[in-house]
């Protein structure tokens, strides 16, 4: 039934029936291999392409010979601390040859700091950890299409798409004429282009295409007689209005398609062309040849005759991946080509005798291109670091968006849909919900990238019905030709199929064939899904929509204080945690010499010592806590690759995103209506779901026009009680508890001298006292925040820290909060079953089992049937049995516990086979009417915490134009009393309440002050005035040239003034600063959308770059 499997240092009992024939690859190798290729070969290719650079006379030649990367200035951790980029200096050996004098100068030139990839597959840019996402783009090559014209006739098209350069398109019309478009200009008869290539006579052209009738029809439309005429005709289309000559036309055509500098098919484009057109052009020819153009047209004629088939753009054989290395190379190429221009210019300007390579080369364009890519490219993303799974998935993400890709608005249904070629390459489950659905995917577990950028999936070779252990990696194109059996096809011990007919896939079709017809077999049932999806037990019993939510929500689980690996796992937990890079691994065999919370020292068998420093309480990108704990003891033996310390969300080397809790599926007093969740106070008391969150605040002392700011303890008008936790410098001490409004860093800013009265001036003159004119600009704890100070960092110019211009001192304060689970927090299981906590109930009032154990969570049974995620029920049953047996179980996706296994395990544990039991009401002790499903389910606390969302405002910033409060928590805004709310008050006839809300509580500036005065003096509230937004409306209408006046009932014009003088007077009397409501930097109106910090760094929020090809091509 089940058997023990060793995962790391722990045992899991697995239900898997299928033998693993292939180890899963390293899960972040897609990033590492690509970057390594770039360092080893990509850079060399670039320098080879650009070298040599000659001046216009051909006299000076600049060659790039070799390059080397130096040592990075700071280590990874230090880079994060100092807010700098983790990079190494790139030095290039350059040779300058003067052909006139034969003089050769060689120099090593510094070409800027090049960002390095960390061992975890990320980059540190300005102290923030970022990931470069791989991009799915159309592969260069030739594509054939066929469509039905409105007249009902089939029309055909062929497009040759290069990596960079002009497009070449052939198309037919209703009369079977064949046209060509060069670089999206107007159509020409296709034979004009063929003639221009040197096939001058009609006879030659007809012969070239075996006297094809379509070519004959096209020749009749073709007015050109010779190659020269054809060249001129093409030139006229490409450069209308310029006088055509045969030479200029020839050189233009040469440059368009046959010049390697202007036209590049790339290695992959040449490979695809040769493969599709059955050519044998050498692979290093990356431009078009005459044969290519003729063969692509010939292939289209074949398609027109009814043979062959059109291409499917969404097939993964026609889409390739641009990973880090290639994306970086493209950026570097842009930088180098800009630099090349500068070098050429300088060669002509500078004096030949004193010229050196150093003088010629300007590295600024190269550095800028790289910086821009890492800092602001759509594919360079702030790493999702909520938990280890989020990190891992982010590095394996495949995006069809970004420069040169699709745009969200333009992408139709077909592009987003699951395609049969995704099998084993791209997960059909894991993709975001919302506008990016289907455009962003995740690499499958066993998928790997081949040198051409196509995703390959592994299969076991089958010879004459016998499955061998030979493993072949196939691209989507290659797989089309074969019949592939599923991984769960039953086999004999020597690898023959047991059944007489085998289920298989052949291209898009499912077939039932004899064993001899099978060519390949899947290596594993989980090869079609991604890592996150492979972590869902009983995935096969869940509806796809809910599985998608389950996979996505696991990435949002907050690392908990006490981790606990699931009782019911899938066996993937260990691999995911190990490859995510959050755990510490032993590099060689040895013995543990010392293991403390700070570090682990291992003595290797060869006698050397290795010290592993552990990360303690660091802030992740998302504000969750990164902390490592040793899991080995002194004198323990360790092997190479063994996990010796747990990171966040890991438990003994296994991924542990949540906790195992006892749940019951029942309704309870309406507290679990609409997916709400009722939890026991035990989860709060025993810190089941307590997590640590760390926020970072910084204060900088700058130079201002009136003098430098100063970080100090001496703050004007502040009592000693407020300063009690500040040290002598005015910076808060570590360990202090702070809450809203407390000073973290005392800082004063010089104020301009104010006008003094005569008396004051006299006193000043006598005593020589210059008033200390400073104002308090201290860093305080924002609204709604509180916690303990865990770390303080001070950076100053004197200590040689790199600070922004104008900043003399920078202080960073880290505040940690322990957040227990509370009402309003979002929780979820792994099956897309999410809900919000509606009530936390006393332990003694919760329903309890016959043995007196109270349940910990009560879920609504109605959440299961309509959503069809039965996996959660299976997990609950099996979890109960696992707890009773004291085991941890593994039920891998598509190869896990069957229904019978679950019943048998329940029997073995001595539990009722139905998985149901009588529950008793904790308040009365009476049994509930029916038996209830009870068991252990793995439940996660998600990053949508109520503490981050709850918000209240009394007085705060107002928008400058409308004078209405801003919106959103981030702006400390108010709650919008919107159109529908106004209707509600209108419906009740609550006229005065409504008037108040629309005027004095909002944007009647005069009324605001007068109302305040009335409240202070205890008088009646005065009549409201004119709202500011009404004045804005009038001004806008007047700006359109409309004469708008406001009349009273008696047709007298009402003058709408600016803020009244008397109000200003009154304000002075009351000591109110009318402008204090405006924050120091004026905040302009916030957008309509809700402000949620989580989405600030989300790729969905970033605007797409404009796309390069037009609608016709997208069709």
From Swiss-Prot:
Q: Name one GO cellular component term.
A: DNA-directed RNA polymerase complex
What is catalyzed by this enzyme?
A: RNA(n) + a ribonucleoside 5'-triphosphate = RNA(n+1) + diphosphate
EC number assigned by the record: 2.7.7.6
Q: Could you tell me which PROSITE patterns the record lists for this protein?
A: RNA_POL_BETA
Class of this enzyme: transferase
Going by the UniProt record, its keywords in alphabetical order are: DNA-directed RNA polymerase, Nucleotidyltransferase, Transcription, Transferase
Q: Report the SUPFAM superfamilies cross-referenced here.
A: beta and beta-prime subunits of DNA dependent RNA-polymerase
Q: Which GO terms describe its molecular function?
A: DNA binding; DNA-directed RNA polymerase activity; ribonucleoside binding
Q: Name one GO biological process term.
A: DNA-templated transcription
Disulfide pairings: none
Region (Disordered), start-end ranges: 1084-1115
Q: Where is the composition biased (Acidic residues)?
A: 1088-1115
Query: Key word Nucleus present in the record?
Result: no
* One Pfam family here: RNA_pol_Rpb2_2
What family is this? Belongs to the RNA polymerase beta chain family.
State what this protein does: DNA-dependent RNA polymerase catalyzes the transcription of DNA into RNA using the four ribonucleoside triphosphates as substrates.
Assembly, per entry: The RNAP catalytic core consists of 2 alpha, 1 beta, 1 beta' and 1 omega subunit. When a sigma factor is associated with the core the holoenzyme is formed, which can initiate transcription.
Question: Protein name, please?
Answer: DNA-directed RNA polymerase subunit beta
The organism encoding this protein is Desulfitobacterium hafniense (strain DSM 10664 / DCB-2)
Encoding gene (name) = rpoB
